[in-house]
Every structure is written in C-alpha cells, then in structure tokens.
Amino acid sequence: MWTDARQATAWAFVWLLLVTAGFVLLRPRSLSGRWPRWPLILLIAALVRLPPALWLPVGAGFDIDSYRLVTDALLSGREVYGAVAGRHPYLPFQMYVMGGMARLAATTGLPYVVAMKLPSILADVALTGLIYRAVIHSRPSDGRGHAWAAYLALLYALNPVSLLVASYHGQFEAVTLLLLAGGWWLWEQRRPAASAAAVGLAILNKTWPVLFLPVVVMRLGSWRARLGYTALALGIPVLVVVAYLVAYDADPAPMLGRALTHRGNAGYWGPSAVLVPAAGVWPSLQPLADVLAALRNWVLGGAALLALWWTQRQSALDAFLTLLLAVVAVTVGFGIQWLLWLIPFALLAEQARWARVYSLAAALMLTIHLYGLHMVPWLAEWLSPPAADWLIRLSGLPAWGVVIAWLVARLRAARAGRPAAEQPRELAAN
C-alpha cells in the first residue's frame, strides 16, 4: 500500500479510467462468439477491485474513521452505540464483520483500510456470479444464452460505480445488496422461507431493503404466507436487536434513533442540490428549501405507494426496480453509496442499456465527491471553495436526470404491459 495518499489517489484515478474504458467498450456485438465462462468473469471482478483497494491508504475519511471508532469499541468490550455517539447508523450486524476484519488486520499486519474494504469486494464478486447464474437460468441453455448472461455479468464486473463504492469509498453497500439479491433469487426459486431469512439479514445490515418486503407480500397467495414471510423477514432483525440490547443492558434510543431515521444528507441530489446552495446566495429561497426538507418523508412514502400500486401486475423484480427508481428519484437526502442500489437489480432485470448510461452518470458524481470531499480533496486545490462546492453539489444532476427518464420509461412499460427485459437480437430471433 502506498503511504503517499496523493500519489495513490492519482494512480487510482488512472485505474478508474482504464476500467471505465473497458466498461464502455464492452458490447454484445456477437452473442454467438466466444465469451468467458463464469470462473473467468469472477476473476475479472476480483482483479478489477483489488489493486486500488490494496494501494489506496485512504477511503472516505468520515466513514473509515467511523469504522475505526466502532471496531475499537467493539473489540474492547464496550457498548458500541453509546460509545461512538451516532457514528454507526445501522443495526448490529455489519459491526461484527468490521470487528472481524479489524482483528485480521491487527494479527496479520494488513492495513486497516484495506481490511475494511475486503468484505465489500468479496460481496461484489459474489454479486457478479449471482447475476450470471440468474440470467442464464432465464435464458436458453445454448451459447447465446450464456453469452447474454456473460455480457450482463461483465457489466457488473467492470462497473465503475461498484468499483468506486467498494474499493475507493470503502462502503459496504455490496454486502447488503448481495443479501437482498439473494433473497430475490431464493424467492424466484420458490424457497420463501430462505428468501425471507436473506431479506431479514439484508434489513439487519441496512434498513432500506425493507422496501422489498411489500413487493413480495403483495405477490403471495394467502394471508398465512404473507404473515409468515413478514414475520421471518422482520423477526430476524428484531431478535438480533433485542439480543444485543439485553447482552449490553443498553438503551435502545442511540441505536434505533439513528438506524430508523437516517435519510442521508440534503443538498446533494435532485432539486435540493440546486435549492440548498442557492438559498445560501438568495436567502428568500430558504423557506422553500425548509419545506422540501420537512416534506421529505411524505414524498418518499407517496412515491413508494404509487410505485407499488402501478407495478402490482409485474414480476417482483420488475416491480422492485421501479420502486427503487421512484424512491431514488424523489429523495431529498442522499448518500453517494446509494448510487449502487439500482445497478445489480437493473442487470438482473436485463436493463443493460439503462444500466450502462446510469452507471456512467453515477460514476461521474462519485468521482467528483470522492476526489472533492472524501479522499484527498483535489478540487479544493484547483477551484475556489464556492466553485468546488457548487460543482460537487451539481455533479449528481446527470445521474438524477437519467433516473427520472428511466423511471418514466418503466412506468410507461408497466402501463402498456410490455416486457421490461431487453431482448438481444440474436435471442429475439429464436
């Protein structure tokens, strides 16, 4: 690992450009040609993510510092939520993964920041394999079906957004996504109990996967099945939380107050990215910014309910992808790692064209944020503070615009009853 963060981030930027070029150049030109098999695809996913994770001595500064506070408290036997004062806005699951990686770093000499990134890299590799397996299961068992599955899996293996979140930022979104995508896959395989357990673990890791629960419940055939699935999916996080509170004789407020109300930061996504900084220049706009922040939960709830109703005749995967798009489209608060949510489910739903365009726009936002705020703040050296702030805030508008257009297209397809998955020409002809 480099000790010079400036040199490391500069070389990491070159690596990002190379991987993004591979992502852009990847095309399903000939689905009858030779495409790599799944072991090679998984190897590509690992080799794309490991170099920057190994040579970068930094991640997103606030997050890595928070992980260190959490693991120090956990390994010293202290109650984490009381000890770190709001720095872990999650339920008690990922902290134990972090604790295990911190102990690994201490015993092997592996740099702490590298150890914190490894679970997300492994989860990303596993997600790549899941995408391949799920797509090939839904396609013909000949070479064309394999080629289409390989293409979609490679779009994740080479995806700049997943690369930035796991290997640069150091966030663990991929772990949550693997559990949630696994829950969907088990649901597709008619294994509702295993599906509910996987979804429960995803909710325990980060609370936002609870959005998947109504999608499944609406598609179960009886009230008994609905209650059983819900009880298992919610029972797992409830039991773990209760066990943690009892074990430490802890006050639930520090844990639940953050985990159940965390909504990201306003002013970096959608209309709030323009309105919040503009209110600093023109104070007359501040009341409008305050109203937008005050209504954020109502807007989120309304968008989610509308998406659930609109997609009730679609498959669980199509409905969930549209639901995620609706939530991301209207949210006021935002975390840059949330940009990864859409990509694995878009590829599982075979929305390759939209996933490609969105990934490039989202990677632009992530790069500007990571190189402007969270790693070595290069932008602060090149631009004045107001210009850097405006650039960082407005960098999300291209990705947000893609989300809006994508959502509109999916809502129209749902209304018309058209299939959401793309049909490659070679497969459509057969």
Predicted regions span which residues?
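Membrane-lumen/periplasm interface segments of multi-pass, membrane-embedded glycan/lipid transferases
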Residues: 258-298
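Multi-pass membrane glycosyltransferase architecture that uses lipid-linked
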Residues: 1-257, 264-266, 293-430
